[in-house]
């Protein structure tokens, strides 16, 4: 992910130096708080993204997740972002699948998957067939953080 982040932060800084951030809105997908930090607060004006998770997401579960993360890893730990949180969500999903199936066997999990739902930092995640249905949020960059402005619904 470093080359992608590096390309994004270089682009954001060049965009701001050219003055385009004052008149052109950008929608960049699959960026996280790490890109904002690498870009610098002066290069994030007019930047939006859509994602399933933001560190600033105002859900009760996310506030607890962030608090536990800070307690465990300290203030010098990397910012929580969509990539790291997705790894955590994967473990939550596996736990919910195994609990519903009452087994770790693939066949049992496969049979149980359509009855699985859980609450995670991003909100409620529900299995529908072989896919998850989960919230996606629109956020605007506010210097080095994202401000979640809407939940996008299908």
Q: What residue spans do the PLM features occupy?
A:
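Short, small-residue-biased leader/transition segments that mark boundaries at the very start
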Residues: 2-7
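Segments of small-molecule ligand-sensing domains
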Residues: 71-84, 95-146
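Tryptophan-centric aromatic hotspots in well-structured domains and transmembrane helices
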Residues: 11-12, 54, 93-94, 146
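Extracytoplasmic/secreted proteins, especially bacterial periplasmic and envelope-associated proteins
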Residues: 10, 60, 64, 68, ...
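A generic local structural motif
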Residues: 12-15, 125
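Extracellular/periplasmic periplasmic-binding protein-like sensory domains
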Residues: 15-88, 142, 152-153
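Cytochrome P450 catalytic core segment centered on helix I
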Residues: 149
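N-terminal start-of-chain detector that recognizes signal peptides
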Residues: 1, 19-27, 66, 93, ...
């Amino acid at each position: 992910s470093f080359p992608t982040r590096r390309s994004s932060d270089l682009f954001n800084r060049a965009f701001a130096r050219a003055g385009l951030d004052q008149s052109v809105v950008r929608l960049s997908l699959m960026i996280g708080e790490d890109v904002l930090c690498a870009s610098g607060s002066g290069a994030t004006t007019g930047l939006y993204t859509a994602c399933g998770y933001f560190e600033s997401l105002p859900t009760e579960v996310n506030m607890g997740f962030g608090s536990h993360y800070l307690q465990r890893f300290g203030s010098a730990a990397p910012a929580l972002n969509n990539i790291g949180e997705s790894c955590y969500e994967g473990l939550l999903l596996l736990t919910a699948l195994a609990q519903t199936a009452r087994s770790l066997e693939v066949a049992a999990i496969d049979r149980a998957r359509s009855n699985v739902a859980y609450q995670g930092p991003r909100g409620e995640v529900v299995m529908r067939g072989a896919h998850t249905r989960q919230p996606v949020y629109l956020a605007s960059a506010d210097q080095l953080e994202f401000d979640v402005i809407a939940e996008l619904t299908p």
